[in-house]
Every structure is written in C-alpha cells, then in structure tokens.
Amino acid sequence: MASVDQSQLCSKSVSMSLSVDDGVQRRTGDYHSNLWDDDFIQSLSTPYGAPCYRERAERLIGEVKEMFNSVRLSPLNDLLQGLSMVDSVERLGIDRHFKNEIKSALDYVYSYWSEKGIGCGRESVVTDLNSSALGFRALRLHGYPVSSDVFKDQNGQFACSANTQTEGEMRGVLNLFRASLVAFPGEKVMEDAERFSAIYLKEALKTVPICSGSLSGEIEYVLEYGWLTNFPRLEARNYIDIFGKDTSPCLQTEKLLELAKLEFNIFHSLQQRELKQVSRWWKDSGFSQLTFTRHRHVEFYTLASCIAIEPKHSAFRLGFAKLCYLGIVLDDIYDTFGTMDELELFTAAIKRWDPSATECLPEYMKGVYMVFYECVNQMAREAEKTQGRDTLSYARNTWEAVFDAFLEEAKWISSGYIPTFEEYLENGKVSFGYRAATLQPILTLDVPLPLHILQEIDFPSRFNDLAASILRLRGDVCGYKAERSRGEEASSISCYMKDNPGATEEDALNQIDTMIKEKIKELNWEFLKPDSNVPISSKKHAFDILRAFYHLYKYRDGFSIANNETKSLVMRTLLETVPF
C-alpha cells in the first residue's frame, strides 16, 4: 500500500489570531457549528486493519477471478452472466481488482453486439432487453462506440415490449432506466426510454407484491440517486445492503458480498487514520476558532474518500479535503465577513504568493493565508512526484482566477448590482471553485496527465466548462433564497429574471432546470465519447468530483446545511463499518 508522508502534507500549524474586535460591522452566514468533535474523531477505532482481513480478501479476489473465467461455459447466457459480473463488481466497489477481467468480458460482449443489441448468450437468436440495456450501459461507460438505436423500432421510434410486471421484466426495465441516464445530446430515444422506464418502475414498486427485497431495493436506490448524484463508495455501501437482501443467494453472490464487505471495512480502517489527520490539522491550525464560517473538513474528507477508494490515493483524499475546506472558508470571507478593503488586500497578497504579503493583512486573515499557502505548495510537491514536473504555477493561476471571481462577486454584493445572466454565469462557474478543487488532487494520482490530456479536462476545456456551469446553476437553485436573505442578490435566478422582464421565479427555475439537464447530456458526451485522445480513466476522478458536489445539492445546499442528509452520508460511508 503506497503511503504519503502525512507530516508534510499541508500540515504546518499556524497560530491564528482570530479575535476581530475592530468596530467594523460584519455580516455572517449564520451557519451551524462543526458537527464532528476532534476528541470523538481521535477516539475512533476498528479491528479491520489487521493482516488477517487483507489475507482473506486476497483469497476471495482469486476466487472471483476464477468466476469471471468460467462465465463463457454456457453459450445460452454467457453474455448476460459476464455483464452481470462486471456490473456487480463495479457497484460493490471492488472493480479495481478485476480490470483485466472486466476488459476481457466487455471485449467479448462487444464482439457479439449488433445494431439490435444482444441476447442472453452468444447463441441466442432473439435479442433481450435486460442484456441489451445492461450491455449498452457498460459498453458506453467504458468508451465502446454503441448506438442508442438498439432501443428503436423499425420506424425509428422508442420501442419496449414490457407489458407485464414479472421480476425478470422489471430488471430489464430497471437496466433500461440506468442506460437512459448516460444519454448523449440529441438521443431522443433515450429521453423516451427514461420517461417510460421511470413511470413503469414507480408503478411497479406500488403495485407488484412479488418484487424481491433485493430488486425493490435496487429500484428504489436507482430512482433516488440516478447517475449524477451517485458515486463509488456511496453506491458500494448501498449495493452491499441490496445484495444482502437476496433471498436465494448462490455461491457466486456470497463470495462477491463477502469480498465487498471486507474491502469496505479494510478501507474504513485507512479512512479513520486519514480522518484523524484532517481533524488534527483543522484543530492545530486554529480553524476551530473561526466562528463565521462553515466547518466542513470532515464532510469534504468524506467526499474525497467516496471518490478515490483505492488505498494508494491518500494524497488525493487528504489534499482534496483540505483544499476544499480552505476554499469554503475563503468563500465565506469574501461573501460575508470581509470588508472590501480587506478583500482587495487579500487578493493582491494571493498574487504575490509570498509569506511577507501577510504583513498588510488583518490578523484574522494572516493565518488563513499561510495555511492556504502551505497547502497549495505541498500539493504541488505531491503532484511533482507523480507527474514529473512542477505544476505550482498552474495551480497558482487557477486560484488567482478564483479569487478574482470571488472579488467580483463581493463587489456585486457591496453595490447591490445584478449582472446579466451571461455575465453572472461566466464569473460564477469560476467562483464555484470546481476547477481549483479538481486540478491539484487529480495531479497527485498515479495517472499521467501530460499537457495535451490535462487541457481536455481542465479549463478552458468543454468538459471543465460544463461541469462548473452545472454546479453553479444547481447551487443557485438550492441556495439562492438563503443568499438573498443575507443580502446577496445576484444569482442565476435573479439574473435570468432581470434579462427577461415579466419572468417569475418559477419561470427562471424551470429554465435553469432545463439548462442543467441539457448540460448533463453534453457532459456525458465529453466524459464518455469513444475514440477520444483522452482515456475515460484520466477523466474519471474529475467527473466523480462533480458527482460528489452535485450530490450535496440533491435535497438542499448540503455545503451550508450539513446536519441532515450530509450527516447521514458521513455516517454510512466514513464512520460505520458494514456488519457481517
């Protein structure tokens, strides 16, 4: 297991003087306090770091590989069996052990793929909805060129023969729904498939008593989380529960489930060690004294460990958690707490990038600046180990753009200015910080990102532009009322209404929702397009960061209100083990 010198990773403690008694009237966001006491976090323990659990997992990995190899023995259902194996190991979060087996299985399926899809086996003479839908989704997610025309009839219209509600048919429609969520722009048949399958599945849950516990749980989960609010460790945690509800498990299911539970709990022991470091960094750096900001260091580490679930990616998880936490502190300084004079000084200090730049800053900003400075520098050193080049200037340019966007929004707040929708979004997709949150962490991964590949992921690529726009728009939908109550008038909603006199808030929200849906399809294309110069594996973590952030906006602004669904996410994926 690769390790990082944790004593060096953004860990320098800076004593902050945070008493602000200068007579200046300051706004605050009135956020709830930190939910995770450092003493509680330091007391966490688990037995799953013991070697015996790793040894048992390794034996099971070998047995599952043998299961992959035996799939092709039956010509009547080998395609469906292979796809089901791929689907299961991916959803259980154990696919990293079977990359060669997954590629071999998908190459085999693709060799039998036709314009009408596939049957259950290589000798099947009739195509099968479940096999075709599962195959379409898996092949598209792995970059194979497959057309959605497989779901059309001879007249070019969406066609589905599902008219009963047997368990087999429901599973086929479920996988059709899952396939429809990875639609590309212009695929109307996939829109029709999504509409049909969603209605069918919701009705099935209400009316069909024969639906097994595992299938009903699977349907409920997919309808709830879909594609963009789902991400690896969250899906693994929930799918383990669903898998465990199978009333007639076979030996294959039992082995997969045992391995998934072991891997989940073994990784949990690593999560605990890293979480303790993040919490101690937060406490020792003096952030616990900040009363005006959102303390979400534990939540950001949770997201990081739900995205990067390979043990060797420790630098990604720790760096992402700390950079995102610092980003949210600085966002609160610019949006509410800081005065315009202070913000101008801080922005200038960032561009100087020198500890001596703190001399002109107010006391409460000095410590924040120094911790931020050390963290960005150390992340650049970590990136140099994997990329073989100095990326600090790249990171600095990224953050300078964010602070310029922060400052522009602060000016709007101060003056009450509401820009045009285009002006707002152009600035807002930078100020959201997606690019800054993504760039340095992905550079620490063991995936080479030469400049020509990085340019396809980072700004100003279409991929980055779409991801940042989606997050800014979704964030506004969830948070514009709270921001307006704090005197922050500019949002995509208010800007749309300004551009379109007579438009209501409902009109604006409907239009923005439509924009988000279209941008998601475009992003699917940028992420999954076949024959790209950039492998999907190089874009995956950047895409999963988008999904993690988008997840926090599923019900409300989960960055600001973290004591509901966000707290549940922390408990289920970070603090609790899976029972055997």
Curated annotation (Swiss-Prot):
Cofactor (UniProt): Mg(2+); Mn(2+)
Catalytic function, reaction form: (2E,6E)-farnesyl diphosphate = (3E,6E)-alpha-farnesene + diphosphate; (2E)-geranyl diphosphate = (E)-beta-ocimene + diphosphate
Documented EC number(s): 4.2.3.46, 4.2.3.106
Pathway listed: Terpene metabolism; oleoresin biosynthesis; Sesquiterpene biosynthesis
Details of cofactor binding: Binds 3 Mg(2+) or Mn(2+) ions per subunit.
Record carries keyword Metal-binding: yes
Chain residues that bind Mg(2+) 3: E483
Positions with a binding annotation for Mg(2+) 1: D331, D335
InterPro entries in the record: Isoprenoid_synthase_dom_sf, Terpene_cyclase-like_1_C, Terpene_cyclase_plant_C1, Terpene_synth_N, Terpene_synth_N_sf, Terpene_synthase-like, Terpene_synthase_metal-bd, Terpenoid_cyclase/PrenylTrfase
Function according to Swiss-Prot or TrEMBL: Terpene synthase (TPS) involved in the biosynthesis of sesquiterpene and monoterpene natural products included in conifer oleoresin secretions and volatile emissions; these compounds contribute to biotic and abiotic stress defense against herbivores and pathogens. Catalyzes the conversion of (2E,6E)-farnesyl diphosphate (FPP) to (3E,6E)-alpha-farnesene and of (2E)-geranyl diphosphate (GPP) to (E)-beta-ocimene.
Domain comment in the entry: The Asp-Asp-Xaa-Xaa-Asp/Glu (DDXXD/E) motif is important for the catalytic activity, presumably through binding to Mg(2+).
Name of protein: (E,E)-alpha-farnesene synthase
Organism from which the protein derives: Picea engelmannii x Picea glauca (Hybrid white spruce)
Taxonomy of the source species: Eukaryota, Viridiplantae, Streptophyta, Embryophyta, Tracheophyta
